[in-house]
UniProtKB/Swiss-Prot annotation:
PROSITE patterns: G_FEOB (PS51711). The gene is feoB. The keyword Transcription does not apply. GTP 2 binds at G35, V36, T37, V38, E39. This is Fe(2+) transporter FeoB. Induction: Iron uptake is repressed by the global regulator Fur.
Length: 773
């Protein structure tokens, strides 16, 4: 079979991701585009004659990049197309928005690269009474047009057949440009590198005349002739860029008049009716909060019901199983405990997180694919405008509920560097999936019937602190107003099950692999330090270990937030949590259960793997049957407790160490708000600078320590009023000083704001091949 590389390109919300998942299934690889942190997805699939590598290009409305501060997606797509890596392009077009989508199609066809138009979302178009003549559209464009409903898999085989039959596009003159434009484009094309095909050189010439900055990286000497060409054009027309765009839109209008009835189409009645409620100025925000709470409730509820299978099953396989092997093969006791506690305990920490995190990713994917997340950004626009940000900046923040890394990376979609930086600074306060795992464990241990409310309050606190951080930045070091907010609201539709499963699997796999490696390594590391004293001797009691000795020195720093000196394990959890938040659970699980593992007598003769696995399945089945009972629906945290008795195991020890629900909640406030994990810190440094990364870390630590201290000292004021009053006043005074210093630093920071990161275009301008990407 012949190998073929295909680029998949289309407008946002055109169904491109769904089509990608339909074609490639689970045969996908996710990475980054070279030199940038924008995600790159590749997949494999086969047709009758070809083995295809499909490259999913970023969603974009056009290939024209007007500003160096914006449109990174356009630059990536343009670079890939001009690189010649793709043998063929598949342009996904939304049939219900044909006129808007065809602008990108015309740009692709003008390049002369073989192209297939995948006319998607025909089911939505039909509901709006839109009729499109497929053959007529194909004839006008000069390339194959394949009708598709990717959510149902309709047209996939026809698309594969078209891929096998692909050939060069017919030489059809689509756009009629004014003759002066063509003359100047041809004159620029003549001085471009001769190894670029003639059609592409002419296209680059038009792009340069339109004001595209990225095409200059390919133009060679032609970029030196651009100013003269524009000067000659301005003697004959007011705005060359406007004339180029107008010629394309006239062509699109002529095509649509012939092949469709889009002018008489009816908007989706269902979408219109739902939007009257969801986008209502009074109901929109409460509905958004309810949807977020429902997503969290279902994730905890269903995930908690599935948890025994992963928890009890992993204990049987990786903890008791390792102990059985150790005793059977006569390993030294310390080695058996080390392996069971370190390796087995690490795996046992990761696997029970899978159900709840997986459910969270599933529901997030559902909300994104259904079209609701775009509405959430619209609803939040008024609040974001008060911060000096567009509503569009709330979209990356919502993504932060899954993981803060793509949330930080998503800030690239914002136009101004000020807006981008403010969003990056706010993103770490959004409660990610890893924090959910910590909250669920503490809620089950301390808050009982109020567990769901406690966790929801932490999610809301994260949003509130992100908003307050935005306000602080607006009135201190990042003054300014938001750019106008224009956003497309896609039609509501039921997401495709296969696409949802694939998206959830990709996110969950990334989480497990990333978290698993860190947790297991940290668990082994902690087990080693937990087994030896500072003098190198093996200890029988973890309170005499090297880890305990070092941690006790640091723990008094956290006394104001309710962490007492004998609870040194909680201090270790905070330090390891800086690597990855999910490691906090692993650390506490390893340390709080260490004494139990050391004291526990394991009898290999009584170990029965089959019985323990059957017990895990049976417990999961009972949990699933009880999941949707009224009592569990009212208190989903109870469903996540699994089989852990409060008197024994990690939860029981943790309950004794913290001593009160107030101390536990204060600890959770600190975990929510303090330094982001290493991955997020790296993303912040990459998207802004190391200086801004440092600012984010210091600001997060200040907010976390201040709020946790205020909460705990107010909650426990009656126990030690003098100490509490001193702590409260110290926190307030310190933050007044910090805000004052930030206001004084405003003028200097504003001047340096534009220099926070090297612009992509400047990087490209230094290379005629666009090597920066």
């Amino acid at each position: 079979m012949k190998k073929l590389t295909i680029g998949l390109i289309g407008n946002p919300n055109s169904g491109k991701t769904t089509l990608f998942n339909q074609l490639t299934g689970s045969r996908q690889r996710v990475g980054n585009w070279a030199g940038v942190t924008v995600e790159r997805k590749e997949g494999q699939f086969s047709t009758t004659d070809h083995q295809v590598t499909l490259v999913d290009l970023p969603g974009t409305y056009s290939l024209t990049t007007i500003s160096s501060q914006t449109s990174l997606d356009e630059q990536i797509a343009c670079h890939y197309i001009l690189s010649g890596d793709a043998d063929l392009l598949i342009n996904v077009v939304d049939a219900s928005n044909l006129e808007r989508n065809l602008y990108l199609t015309l740009q692709l066809l003008e390049l002369g690269i073989p192209c297939i138009v995948a006319l998607n979302m025909l089911d939505i178009a039909e509901k709006q009474n839109i009729r499109i003549e497929i053959d007529a559209l194909s004839a006008r464009l000069g390339c194959p047009v394949i009708p598709l409903v990717s959510t149902r898999g309709r047209g996939i085989e026809a698309l594969k057949l078209a891929i096998d039959r692909y050939k060069a596009n017919e030489n059809v003159e689509l756009v009629h440009y004014a003759q002066p434009l063509l003359n100047e484009a041809d004159s620029l094309a003549k001085v471009m590198p001769s190894d670029i095909p003639l059609k592409q050189r002419r296209w680059l010439g038009l792009q340069m005349l339109e004001g595209d900055i990225y095409s200059r990286a390919y133009a060679g000497e032609a970029s030196q002739h651009l100013d003269a060409a524009l000067a000659r054009l301005r003697n004959e027309m007011d705005d060359p860029a406007l004339h180029i765009a107008d010629a394309r839109y006239q062509c699109i209008a002529a095509i649509c008049d012939v092949v469709s009835n889009t002018l008489t189409a009816e908007p989706s009645r269902f979408t219109t009716a739902v939007d009257k409620i969801v986008l209502n100025r009074f109901l929109g925000l409460p509905i958004f909060l309810f949807v977020m709470y429902l997503m969290f409730l279902l994730a905890i509820n269903i995930g908690g019901a599935l948890q025994p299978l992963f928890d009890v099953g992993s204990v049987a396989l990786f903890v008791h199983g390792i102990q059985w092997i150790g005793y059977t093969l006569h390993f030294p006791d310390w080695l058996t405990i080390f392996l069971a506690q370190g390796l087995g305990g690490g795996i046992n920490t990761v696997l029970p997180l899978v159900p709840q995190i997986g459910m969270m990713y599933l529901f997030l994917s559902f909300l994104e694919d259904s079209g609701y997340m775009a509405r959430a950004a619209f609803v939040m626009d008024r609040l974001m405008q008060a911060l000096g940000l567009p509503g569009k900046s709330f979209v990356p923040l919502i993504v932060g509920f899954g993981c803060n890394v793509p949330s930080v990376m998503g800030a690239r979609t914002l136009d101004a560097p000020r807006e981008r930086l403010m969003t990056i600074m706010m993103a770490p306060f959004m409660s990610c999936g890893a924090r959910l795992a910590i909250f669920a464990v503490f809620a089950a241990a301390f808050f009982g019937q109020n567990g769901a409310l406690a966790v929801f309050s932490l999610y809301m606190l994260g949003i509130v602190m992100a908003v307050l951080t935005g306000l602080m930045l607006k009135y201190t070091i990042m003054r300014g107003e938001a750019t106008p907010f224009v956003m497309e609201l896609p039609v509501y539709h039921v997401p495709h099950v296969k696409s949802l499963i694939i998206q959830t699997w990709q996110r969950l796999k990334g989480f497990v692999l990333r978290a698993g490696k860190v947790i297991i390594i940290v668990s082994i590391f902690l087990s080693a330090f937990n087994s030896f004293s500072l003098s190198g001797k093996i200890v029988d009691n973890i309170n005499d270990s090297a880890l305990a000795s070092v941690s006790r020195v640091i723990t008094p720093v956290f006394k104001p937030i309710g962490v007492h000196e004998d609870n040194w394990q909680a201090t270790v959890g905070l330090f390891t949590g800086a690597m990855a938040k999910e490691v906090v659970v692993g650390t506490l699980n390893t340390l709080y259960t260490a004494e139990n593992i050391q004291d526990e007598e394991f009898n290999p003769a009584e170990f029965n793997l089959g019985e323990e696995l059957f017990s895990a399945v049976d417990e999961t089945w009972q949990s699933l049957k009880d999941t949707f009972s009224l009592s569990v629906l009212m208190n989903p945290i109870e469903a996540s407790k699994g089989d852990g008795e409060m008197g024994t195991g990690a939860m029981g020890v943790m309950d004794q160490k913290f001593g009160s629900a107030a101390a536990a909640y204060s600890y959770l406030i600190f975990v929510l708000l303090y330094v982001p994990c290493i991955s997020v810190m790296g993303a912040i440094a990459r998207e802004s600078s190391r200086g801004w990364m440092g600012f984010s870390i210091l600001w997060g630590l200040n907010i976390a320590y201040s709020l946790a201290t205020l909460f705990y000292q107010v909650a426990s004021y009656s126990q030690h009023p003098t100490y509490s009053l001193v702590c409260i006043l110290a926190v307030i005074l310190f933050n007044i000083v910090v805000i004052g210093l930030l206001r004084r630093a405003r003028s200097r920071v504003d001047v340096e704001l534009l220099a926070t990161r090297k612009s992509v275009s400047s990087c490209c301008a230094a290379s005629t091949t666009g090597d920066c990407h």
